[in-house]
């Protein structure tokens, strides 16, 4: 690949692989070090991981803010230190007496605009250190609740196995939501503990599994073809097309003499090139200012 070429890949990350390993594989296949991803997926999880190559890495912070879809399995009756199947068991409780109606009601209480305490084993920094590093060192970690939106959280199937209950769920939630924490909190609400045994991300904003590139971990994997930055931006944000004269000013980050339609708006030249992301100017009515210039 020409290292000046930039674009976005949608990778279907397999379970058992870290997000960083996906980045490493893309670096080797694409022949460039400048690769990043939008929104980490835990090693046990599979599904959509949006990857930026070269200049497209500058889009990732904005792409990661989209809402996301997941399918998952919640096991009720067992809690773990990580809130998923990777961690040590912290509690076991007979969940067999819990009926389906109670499960649905507990899930409803985790729907909408909620205050969620993130999973303790997470990449959130506490006093300059990652929370997961503190937990692994045996330190107590107290994370503050954060506002998240869970617009959909539904049970698709409920399966009973002795003292535990497995609930297959589908969820749509805002950036920053921990599905592991939803499992934990449903279990806590029901008084039996809960954790995730499976997690698959099926969508990040406009990017879903149908857009996933070839299997990059196959032995005979070929260099994937990324979508252009303009294509990715047009899927993700409102678009404003500008003239050649306007494009010249945008290339140096000047204000625009009109208000763009959204807090993140893609500016595309007559040539089809993505020039920048702009937002309305809070200080000057009727103008817009650059979030980032991409050329």
UniProtKB/Swiss-Prot annotation:
UniProt cross-references to InterPro entries, sorted A to Z: PsdUridine_synth_cat_dom_sf, PsdUridine_synth_N, PUA_sf, tRNA_psdUridine_synth_fam2_C, tRNA_psdUridine_synth_TruB, TruB_C
Cited Pfam families: TruB_C (PF09142), TruB_C_2 (PF16198), TruB_N (PF01509)
Enzyme class of the recorded protein, top EC level: isomerase
Sorted UniProt keywords: Isomerase, tRNA processing
Catalytic activity: uridine(55) in tRNA = pseudouridine(55) in tRNA
One GO process term, biological-process aspect: mRNA pseudouridine synthesis
CDD domains membership: PseudoU_synth_EcTruB
Disulfide bonds: none
Residue positions of the active site: 42 (nucleophile)
Domain of life: Bacteria
EC numbers, comma separated: 5.4.99.25
GO molecular function list: RNA binding; tRNA pseudouridine(55) synthase activity
Database matches in NCBIfam families: TruB
PANTHER family for this protein: PSEUDOURIDYLATE SYNTHASE TRUB1 (PTHR13767:SF2), TRNA-PSEUDOURIDINE SYNTHASE (PTHR13767)
Family: Belongs to the pseudouridine synthase TruB family. Type 1 subfamily.
Task performed by this protein: Responsible for synthesis of pseudouridine from uracil-55 in the psi GC loop of transfer RNAs.
Protein name: tRNA pseudouridine synthase B
Species for this entry: Cutibacterium acnes (strain DSM 16379 / KPA171202) (Propionibacterium acnes)
Gene field: truB
């Amino acid at each position: 690949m020409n290292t000046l070429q930039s674009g976005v890949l949608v990778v279907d990350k397999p379970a058992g692989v870290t997000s960083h390993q996906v980045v490493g594989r893309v670096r080797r296949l694409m022949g460039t070090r400048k690769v990043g991803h939008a929104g980490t997926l835990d090693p046990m999880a599979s599904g959509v991981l949006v990857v930026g190559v070269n200049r497209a890495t500058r889009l990732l912070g904005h792409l990661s803010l989209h809402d996301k879809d997941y399918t998952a399995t919640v096991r009720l009756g067992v809690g773990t230190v990580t809130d998923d199947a990777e961690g040590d068991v912290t509690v076991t409780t007979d969940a067999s007496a819990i009926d389906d109606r109670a499960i649905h009601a507990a899930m409803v209480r985790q729907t909408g605009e909620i205050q969620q305490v993130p999973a303790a084993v997470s990449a959130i920094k506490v006093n300059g250190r990652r929370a997961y590093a503190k937990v692994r060192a045996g330190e107590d970690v107290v994370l503050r609740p954060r506002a998240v939106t869970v617009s959909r959280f539904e049970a698709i199937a409920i399966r009973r196995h002795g003292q535990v209950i497995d609930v297959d769920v589908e969820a749509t939630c805002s950036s920053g939501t921990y599905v592991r924490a939803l499992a934990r909190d449903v279990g806590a609400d029901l008084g039996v503990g809960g954790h995730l045994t499976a997690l698959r991300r099926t969508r990040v904003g406009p990017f879903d599994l149908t857009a996933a590139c070839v299997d990059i971990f196959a032995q005979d994997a070929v260099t994937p073809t990324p979508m252009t930055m303009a294509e990715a931006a047009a899927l993700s944000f409102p678009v404003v097309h500008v003239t050649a004269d306007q494009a010249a000013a945008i290339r140096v980050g000047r204000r625009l003499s009109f208000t763009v339609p959204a807090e993140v708006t893609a500016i595309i030249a007559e040539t089809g090139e993505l020039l920048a992301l702009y937002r309305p100017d809070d200080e000057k009515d009727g103008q817009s200012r650059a979030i980032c210039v991409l050329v």
